[in-house]
Amino acid sequence: MASGGREVPRVAIVCDWLTTYGGAEKVVKSIHELFPDAPIFTSQYSRKQINWFDDCQVYVGWVNIFPARLRKILAVPRALYFNHLHRKLRHYDTIITVCTAESKGTKLHPHQTGICYLQGPPTQYFWGMYDDYVKNPGFGKLNFIVRFFFKLLVGPLRKIDWKFAQRPTVLVANSSYSAAETEKYYNRSARVLFPPVEVDTFTLSSTDAVSEEEFFITTSRQVNWKRLDIAIQACLLSGKRLVLVGDGAEHGILQQLAGDSPLIRFIPRIDSPEELNALVSQAKGFIFPSIEPFGIAPIEALSAGVPVIALKQGGALDYIHEGKNGTFFDEQTVESLVAAMRRFESMTFHKQQVSASAKVFSDARFKQELQRIVDDATSK
């Protein structure tokens, strides 16, 4: 019982999948820390791939019989799973959903409040990034088969996705960009709550100077829509060093693009946040060429006192302030990025000020604001 005799609402957490270390998983982790007694319901869970939830009560759906690598083509099975999940949730009062895809479709019982945290714009392979997905589904030699069936099914799947988006009581978006896209495609307004970032882990370098060999950096999964090819080509044309941290389906293609140039360095993986901070904090600038719903990596760079050169679209508009903690380039082209890098060279940034601009995205701030949203929604 809560103070005043009011019962403490029983909370359940629902998410699409827990199969890797990513932004959505960080959000789930933070929410569970806020509500430690809440069980987690998800369609797929890979304990071998992610150990954040070893001590949590995780309930997995029948979709888990499929390999996690097939996640992209499991939209229909996931939709079926989440459409019937309410049968297992009847004893809970508040359902908090962290949604990238279909989990927002979880039905609510009349006594329940549903708060859906949208980890990005409406399911992107149905809506805003449909053309990119059709062009390259990411299945190599099987792309033509996936492309054929996806084109065949996307119409009905969009209708289901729209219907699912009407079910939560409250929608919460991870950026102003995501909120605008939510209104555009789902015809629903969403409150904006920036996701938690480990800003305390990424700190200023102990020295004021950057590395003796100045370099730019980007940390990202190496997939086609991240447009890391633009960053590589811009640095090659500008004669600037670039360090790329990460791996992915495009890794080999990006290596071919870089050739034997000593300007480009690849680091497939850095497991330790402290090691990553040590590297990032020595960079001259962080290059962010993709259209992201939010973008955790640029915030981490800012927290380390490193200014960001970002495409003037997506979530970056919420936290990059021209001339204060970075600069923008207008078009997703090599030429536009090169021009921004030249402009960047003439700018002066103060590391303390750059770092301070990231502190508003702390985990503590996220939990405090989410608790307020939950209290507001459940008090009505």
Where are these regions (language model features)?
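Conserved donor-binding/catalytic core segment of Leloir-type glycosyltransferases
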Residues: 203-226, 232-243
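Nucleotide-activated donor-binding/catalytic signature segment of Leloir-type glycosyltransferases, i.e.
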Residues: 252-270, 274
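Membrane-proximal helix-turn-helix segments that form the acceptor-binding/catalytic region
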Residues: 86, 137-171
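Acidic donor-binding loop of glycosyltransferase active sites
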Residues: 216, 281-293, 306
